[in-house]
Amino acid sequence: MSESGQEQNRGTNTSPNNAENNNNSNAASGPLNGGAEQTRNITVSIQYSYFTPERLAHLSNISNNDNNENNSAASGSTIANGTGPSFGIGNGGHQPDGALVLSFRDVPASTPQDRLNSFISVAAQLAMERFNRLLNRPKGISKDEFDKLPVLQVSDLPKAEGPLCSICYDEYEDEVDSTKAKRKRDSENEEESEGTKKRKDNEGAPLRTTADNDSNPSITNATVVEPPSIPLTEQQRTLNDEETNPSYKHSPIKLPCGHIFGRECIYKWSRLENSCPLCRQKISESVGVQRAAQQDTDEVAANEAAFERIRRVLYDPTAVNSTNENSSAPSENTSNTTVPTIGNASSGEQMLSRTGFFLVPQNGQPLHNPVRLPPNDSDRNGVNGPSSTTQNPPSNSGGSNNNQSPRWVPIPLTLFQFHSPNPNPSASDSSASPSAANGPNSNNTSSDATDPHHNRLRAVLDHIFNVAQRGTSDTSATTAPGAQTVHNQGRNDSSSSDTTQGSSFLENISRLTGHFTNGSRDNNNDNNHSNDQQRGGSTGENNRNNLFSSGVASYRNQNGDVTTVELRNNNSAAFPPTDENPSQGQGSSSSDTTIHNDVPNDNNEQRSSQ
């Protein structure tokens, strides 16, 4: 998901003479036109796209393209001119699938940048919660609709059904008559209510008697004691549990389609699905309208709560004052980030864009605990990478950052570099990533590529997607001989190896989703074959030697002869003799002659020749 925020100034002086005041954060906070407060209109567009293996592969190809440097420079100039950012995820990406647009009018121009970042974070959280509700909508039926289904007796079951439930294969049992159970519960409630009434009457009479008799305070103290309310609380809790999680017996129940299941089993199924487990016919036709109305009500309530938070962020003066007190410390780390200005702009419209990944939690849990901005300067440098196309929230140093409201921290696309950094210092300027070359600290590309924070980010992502971390070890760590050979081959070979390692993330995504399994295996086989050819076949033979360290191998030829050899870390012993070189098969070890005693016909001639 990508965020694109649009700010339009109203009432500000946009003449070219005041262009030098763009970097002054207090330029728009002063009064204008006789003390009137400056305001602006803010429009935030939350653009979203659906990630598929094909699109992830397309994004990986774009990130590895050498033309990203020119594209990022052109995009940076476009944003500076106020014509808007490029749509899609990353430069040259596809058009977004949709957008959630929020517009707010008459926002005070003196609103600090931290408040605007919080506003964008709340808008992004609103969009993510809406996606959660769309993806995790309940599909089951209510308890009232389930109770309308007819319950059968075991004796009334057709002979074709049998006495077993087709879901759990347990025997059916007759359900207790609901009318009798209801009468029993009503009688118990009446008896309990009568007992409570008698207890209250008995407690009230001594109380009136002892009120006139002041000479015996001990009796008064004994009659003032109130009855315990534990039974009523437990009874109410039991009723609530029975309504939410009712207990049914394994009585046969008939669905509208005619299939019969156990009542307990089909109730658990109906809480999740409104269809028959066998034929997928709907169980209840009126559930869709009721569920849609309930979902609309919940969505309206959630939107109102989010809009109230945004209103407090933008228009509440007390919140603005508290934010100004918390953010009184000056910002120090502004060299690695491009912070959009709040003051007078050279044009009447200013655009800011941020691009990042957001992870949707499982089981539809709400996103109430966003990620906090790291307080350390080193962590901020690791998150806010040097990039001219992605603009992240400003990082204010100091201890006051811990008191600020939590916010989303988008991960820039430029940090998703799964290839190993180029160790050659002479080629660092040309082989470095475009995002690092475009940053203000482009002279330290080699040190940024080997930054431990990048390695830590790579390790976290590898742990999430169960990808073996390759190419991120320190210089002191020991590596395989084959990896050292590829590491020292030069610039041409390093580009191909980087592409192979960069695709591991996409291949694992495809493996998790069940797509392109055969294609990824074929690619891996081709890559291994090409690497073996470049290394003189040493790697393939080493893998064969390490495949089986010891054991016995048997081979049967076309004539029916069986040859058995022992595997003793010898590659030649693992392969059976061929018909073209019969002398090699006859010159096997002594163990072959002892095993071939039971082989008829042709093998006898071989033993005689030996």
From Swiss-Prot:
For this record, the Gene Ontology CC terms, alphabetical, are:
cytoplasm; nucleus; peroxisome
Q: Which residues cross the membrane?
A: none
**What Gene3D superfamilies is this protein classified in?**
Zinc/RING finger domain, C3HC4 (zinc finger) (3.30.40.10)
Write down the superkingdom of origin.
Eukaryota
| GO term, biological process aspect, one | response to misfolded protein
Q: Where are the zinc fingers (RING-type)?
A: 240-280
Q: Name one matching Pfam family.
A: zf-RING_2
**Biased composition, Polar residues: where in the chain?**
1-10, 210-223, 319-348, 471-492, 533-554, 592-610
Region of interest (Disordered), ranges:
1-36, 176-231, 318-348, 360-453, 471-502, 514-554, 569-610
Q: Please indicate if the UniProt record lists Zinc as a keyword.
A: yes
| Ranges annotated as biased composition (Basic and acidic residues) | 194-203
Q: Which UniProt keywords apply?
A: Metal-binding, Zinc, Zinc-finger
Single Gene Ontology MF annotation = ubiquitin-protein transferase activity
Per UniProt, the ranges with Low complexity bias are: 11-36, 384-406, 425-447, 493-502
Q: Which SUPFAM superfamilies does the protein's record reference?
A: RING/U-box
Q: What else is known?
A: Present with 172 molecules/cell in log phase SD medium.
Role, per record: Plays a specific role in mating-type regulation of yeast, by acting post-translationally to control the stability or activity of the SIR4 proteins.
> What is the name listed in the Swiss-Prot or TrEMBL entry for this protein?
Protein SAN1
Species of origin reads: Saccharomyces cerevisiae (strain ATCC 204508 / S288c)
Starting at the broadest rank, the lineage of the source organism is: Eukaryota, Fungi, Dikarya, Ascomycota, Saccharomycotina
